[in-house]
């Protein structure tokens, strides 16, 4: 919804929410929450508006910079990393002053509480107090003031510099006055001169180091803090006055009230000699304690008011929610940025923000920046500028890998903090040995009668939500709600309607446990709150998590972020077998601390769900700051609770941090609800930035497209069939009206006459545009709108140009497709083979040879089908996804079906399913389809290929010798008009080779014998074959039998050297598991391979129909698979059961159609496939 009361109206959502980063801003002292309104952005664009790294080791301590960031824009302001600190020669002054005052504060405190220390330091304390610096004997209040001053000096606070400088000037003036009095002893004169010299040196150094004290103090409730201080001092004075009246000691009555005021309020700065007498010694410490308590309370109130005054405003939260809607898809902790006790700083562009909290001088950022990742560096710069402005030490808790890299680029270092547990709901299941513990816990909870209810917060009534909040408070095991970077800290807020509540309900209908989860983008949830009743049964949490994961699809959830496990890798590595002593010691130390902080419990409670572990990092500026950042994190997360601390659940901020233009847009809501960002498209890059990266010709064409659109021309209209193809138009009568459509390849402009070359699938023709013949517009309009590559539709009549070229005389034309990228060279086309593969569409558009190859492939496929149909075969389709990989020996591709939670294989061959059809009585059957083998890619292999398998009942492998030859010869006839194939000639050009007639047939063993010059037959021993292989330098494996060695010899010595098409028959039985043994020759199977010019084209079997023998052979294959052979076939019980119903004697053929096309066209497989697999860039 939009809110009324805007200061102005914007024409679009994009205009209001976008902010230009073109005007570089200054960071430094102008970059902070209080100064964000001073940024004046330029004109806005839709894509820079309110509009998302890799390679970090989970154990890395320092993240390497990946280099430049595309589109991030220039950094504004100086870097604040350790290497970019002040280089002034006085940069040491703040630390030295802080340490000096801090030492005095520490000694003063010890002296105030210990009489022994007070006695030991009496002489130096009196000298310092008299001549150098205020150092009363006992004043806890003064010690606290000095401690605050020391901390402020170290943090380079300007106000601390001013106070210390004023103190030094006043002390120097007092020394001058004492020296001028002239009634001092020699010791006093020495002390006064020494003190004056020290004061002058300190004053000079402070003045020279003025620029080193740049830090400001945040706005806070000074009046409220002063009131608390006055009230505390008044109470302290009254109580102290009463005590001194009860225990006056020797203190005179008229001096008692002034003495108390000096000790409680005046920090005992007045000389004790001014008062008559002394009270009891123990009262001085009590009086100073009262003063210190008043100061402490006032300081806490001031700090709390600073945090509350500068916390999220409603507009800030509304802007953050808008950024989350546009860019929060990948940040599981992003929603926690809406926590209202945090502060926020925005990038100058308004496209990113960082939420943070200040504890003990550490500005602790909460996780990753929110918003557009391209604007993250700007947000980090603004945040570091804020730290510099107020003298805070920067720190980050819970950054992701991408976020940690961004912080690293800004000068911080990163340390692995732990891992976040992410459940992928599509992969979650209760089955399997790894989930046994969860499965048993869920079973126990269900037996106890528990059920689970899942609702969105918006669907819960106010009364029910009140009960939920009461239960959450009652079941909390701590006094306060914990959390900072990974907790929301509130329940029942109307703005959190998308949050998810999961409840466990017992048999009586009572809620016994609950989970509250915040949105993570649109398809995820992130755990915020987990509570359970002490009376809930074991397994309650496991039941809720499991039910949420198992029912996630109905809720539109694909991922769940569970708890965060600190030091997960240390627990895991230290428990591994063979872990080193350091890993075991570190794990033991963590186990010890787990007694109090549940480190191991959180790890194990997440690990049982088998989640994905995503590392999270802590970032810091300097290693010396790690302890301080750690303590600040402990305080922020609520493990260390400071007095009077509170965590606000409502908006307390009064200083909006959103950029002024965004705040004035009227789109942000004061109640913190999300703005209307439906008109924004976050996935789009900045238009100007994107256009600047495009080639010039593309930008020119885009500009023409915009001109056409402005003129009302649809550059991509609805299709209308042309009356003629180009080929038909060239043969048409001159008086016939003709409409053709195609792509413009060339344009020649002669002023009033224009010639263009137009191509469609059937061919090319010249079109002639003459101003005198055009019915609408002029040739200039054509040249202004049309570029090479554009698709146009032209109408007219056929005629001739002056040079006698047959042309279409155009009377009308229209654009039917604007080409935004230029075509390759009009004469050479695409010459790079890799480019032709990757941009096949361009190759087809400009290269006639590529079109001819596509057409030839189509003719081959059609011929194969027609030949088989003519023989009475029927075509079928069998499953491509198979549960068992079989039918051939090859490595399969593996995928997974979530519904049945099982692996499936892309088929390597359709053979086993086709044979099932043969069992069923389909006597002549074939399939022409895709098969997949996870093997090499080269000139003749592609992982995805077209395979023909055909089976003919009552036939054998000899029948398919003639059948296969006929298939190939018919295909060549269809492609070339004659039974020829193309082969490279002596000059490298393709020449036709006749393949008509009968082809040669040889046995495998005879062919191997010819190649070796030694006789080899099925009875040749394995040892002899090995010797022959060694002599021929053919490698083999030790576990191969004689058949495998013969096959290896055949592949190297015969197949690779074959030229003319040849059938090699009778392969060894051991390498043909699905083939019947030869009817008359033992040791070989009835199988042949067709080889031509070194490439295997087809294979055929007399199929093995004996189910007993088939089972034995497949069992042998399954043993090989179990032994680790990835290519061996698995045992398919369903296929074997089908074979037991008897399959008729059958001859089977398998042919690689891609290789057939290669043979006929003389091209490689990459050239003949429309889209071969190409290695990614």
Swiss-Prot record:
Binding annotation for Mg(2+) 2: 1096
Catalytic activity: tRNA(Lys) + L-lysine + ATP = L-lysyl-tRNA(Lys) + AMP + diphosphate; L-lysyl-tRNA(Lys) + a 1,2-diacyl-sn-glycero-3-phospho-(1'-sn-glycerol) = a 1,2-diacyl-sn-glycero-3-phospho-1'-(3'-O-L-lysyl)-sn-glycerol + tRNA(Lys)
PROSITE patterns: AA_TRNA_LIGASE_II
Chain intervals with Basic and acidic residues compositional bias: 681-693
Region described as Phosphatidylglycerol lysyltransferase: 1-676
Region (Disordered): 1-40, 61-85, 673-693
Cellular compartments per GO CC: cytosol; plasma membrane
Ranges that cross the membrane: 93-113, 135-155, 159-179, 189-209, 227-247, 281-301
Sorted UniProt keywords: Aminoacyl-tRNA synthetase, Antibiotic resistance, ATP-binding, Cell membrane, Ligase, Lipid metabolism, Magnesium, Membrane, Metal-binding, Multifunctional enzyme, Nucleotide-binding, Transferase, Transmembrane, Transmembrane helix, Virulence
Region (Lysine--tRNA ligase) location: 677-1177
UniProt cross-references to InterPro entries, sorted A to Z: Aa-tRNA-synt_II, aa-tRNA-synth_II, aa-tRNA-synth_II/BPL/LPL, LPG_synthase_C, Lys-tRNA-ligase_II, Lys-tRNA-ligase_II_N, Lys-tRNA-synth_II_C, NA-bd_OB-fold
Cofactor note: Binds 3 Mg(2+) ions per subunit.
Membrane topology (UniProt): Multi-pass membrane protein
GO terms, biological process: lipid metabolic process; lysyl-tRNA aminoacylation; response to antibiotic
Low complexity bias locations: 65-82
GO MF term set: ATP binding; lysine-tRNA ligase activity; magnesium ion binding; phosphatidylglycerol lysyltransferase activity; tRNA binding
EC number(s) given by UniProt: 6.1.1.6, 2.3.2.3
Required cofactor names: Mg(2+)
Protein localization: Cell membrane
Biased composition (Polar residues): 8-21
Positions of Mg(2+) 1 binding: 1089, 1096
Function: Catalyzes the production of L-lysyl-tRNA(Lys)transfer and the transfer of a lysyl group from L-lysyl-tRNA(Lys) to membrane-bound phosphatidylglycerol (PG), which produces lysylphosphatidylglycerol (LPG), one of the components of the bacterial membrane with a positive net charge. LPG synthesis contributes to the resistance to cationic antimicrobial peptides (CAMPs) and likely protects M.tuberculosis against the CAMPs produced by competiting microorganisms (bacteriocins).
Family that this chain belongs to: In the N-terminal section; belongs to the LPG synthetase family. In the C-terminal section; belongs to the class-II aminoacyl-tRNA synthetase family.
NCBIfam families in the record: lysS_bact, PRK00484.1, PRK02983.1
Protein name as catalogued: Lysylphosphatidylglycerol biosynthesis bifunctional protein LysX
Source taxonomy: Bacteria, Bacillati, Actinomycetota, Actinomycetes, Mycobacteriales
